[in-house]
Amino acid sequence: MANKPSAEELKKNLSEMQFYVTQNHGTEPPFTGRLLHNKRDGVYHCLICDAPLFHSETKYDSGCGWPSFYEPVSEESIRYIKDLSHGMQRIEIRCGNCDAHLGHVFPDGPQPTGERYCVNSASLRFTDGENGEEING
């Protein structure tokens, strides 16, 4: 794992929601994330370490209330952890570089993968492919 900033540094630089989601495995309320309806072309990066995670071409509207993707940029970009919390069996997804919590992956997505990477906006930074503008979730 890459060196990541200390908890103190992160608390200083992140919103409460961003810290809660990325560091405490939290979940933002559905339909509230800043990047949920973003339709611009570009790349979604980890908010903590800026590692690329998802291309906009793989984003789709799953109706679940969080940004959804059917495929990460690479196998190494995502770390998968069995999550048995809240009486459920799920697969947690974390940044493969810095271990920040991103969300969960489910086997109910579209082809070609059949997977739905359900990601908290608060864990992402979007970089616009045309003008380079960055938007923190």
From Swiss-Prot:
Catalytic residue positions: C118 (nucleophile)
Cofactor note: Binds 1 zinc ion per subunit. The zinc ion is important for the structural integrity of the protein.
Catalytic reaction equation(s): L-methionyl-[protein] + [thioredoxin]-disulfide + H2O = L-methionyl-(R)-S-oxide-[protein] + [thioredoxin]-dithiol
InterPro entries tied to this protein: Met_Sox_Rdtase_MsrB, Met_Sox_Rdtase_MsrB_dom, Mss4-like_sf
GO annotation, biological process: protein repair; response to oxidative stress
Cofactor: Zn(2+)
Listed Pfam families: SelR
Keywords on record: Metal-binding, Oxidoreductase, Zinc
EC number: 1.8.4.12
Gene3D superfamilies reported in the protein's UniProt record: Peptide methionine sulfoxide reductase
Keyword Zinc in record: yes
Record's GO cellular component terms: cytoplasm
Residue ranges annotated for the MsrB domain, each copy included: 7-129
Entry annotated with the keyword Manganese: no
GO molecular function: peptide-methionine (R)-S-oxide reductase activity; zinc ion binding
UniProt: Zn(2+) binding residues: C46, C49, C95, C98
UniProt cross-references to HAMAP family, sorted A to Z: MsrB (MF_01400)
Matching PANTHER family: METHIONINE SULFOXIDE REDUCTASE, METHIONINE-R-SULFOXIDE REDUCTASE B1
Family the entry assigns: Belongs to the MsrB Met sulfoxide reductase family.
Name used for this protein in its record: Peptide methionine sulfoxide reductase MsrB
UniProt organism field: Escherichia coli O9:H4 (strain HS)
